Amino acid sequence: MLAMVRDTGYNLVLVVHILAVVVAFAPAFVHPFLVRQTRSHDLADRFQIISLMQENGQRIYAPALAAAGLLGFTLTGMSDQLYQLSQLWLWLSAGCWLAMNGLLHGLILKAEKQMANGDTSAQKRAEIGSGVLSLLFILTLILMIFKPGF
């Protein structure tokens, strides 16, 4: 069983999976700082910076999050039955991934778009969404490392 998990094809998919995770979650940690740093800029510049953040979220970060989960499912399928979705850690990780996608698409990207259009009240929603997304990411990371139920 472990031979399949450690073979070159599996390892290549694992590298791309980890890379997708890094790309997907970079803004969850960086964007709150960028938003605070834009406060010293005039409103037009501030809205332009936030607009770029939102566009990158749709073009780069959201697809990376989707790819990270799909590659995770691919790794499960490549594991020669070593890992199965019936295992607690994978089931919970999949649930976290779905929740993170819902947060990103349903709250964070929408709030960033509203902020880019001048709605300063949306900043709090974006910050809360990013915070919850970060916590879900940490939970998923713990699940992936400790694998409860494996």
Residue ranges with predicted function:
Residues 1-150:
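Polytopic transmembrane helical bundles with strong interfacial aromatic enrichment
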